């Protein structure tokens, strides 16, 4: 009978230890799910915050584009006018400079021709 009592006490002790281990495991699992819930909440909040920033940036860009389009059109018109005026001034200047350039080219060709003749006469 003593042996039966000792075996029963040992069995109860093992069962109690097993339940204690299960309780510790249950606590770990509960803590894991709590951490997972907190992490998911943080991630979703960060995602939604980033989406809000992206939407704000998109809205900002659209507003600035709307503001800058008239300015860009105005600058293009001014550049066209400046190009027209520049062309009006350059065309007569180019016409005046062309004879000078042609004269210079003829003088340089004559000089090169003389140098070639001198080189030939020296080499012979």
UniProtKB/Swiss-Prot annotation:
List modified residues, type Pyrrolidone carboxylic acid: 21
GO cellular component annotations of the record: extracellular region
Q: Which domain of life is it from?
A: Eukaryota
The UniProt keyword set, sorted, is:
Antifreeze protein, Pyrrolidone carboxylic acid, Secreted, Signal
Glycoprotein among the record's keywords? Answer: no
Q: What is the predominant subcellular site recorded for this chain?
A: secreted
Where does the protein end up? Answer: Secreted
Q: Where is the signal peptide?
A: 1-20
| Statement: the UniProt record of this protein carries the keyword Ubl conjugation | no
As for family, the record states: Belongs to the apolipoprotein A1/A4/E family.
Known role = Antifreeze proteins lower the blood freezing point.
> What is the protein name for this chain?
Type-4 ice-structuring protein
- Which source organism? Paralichthys olivaceus (Bastard halibut)
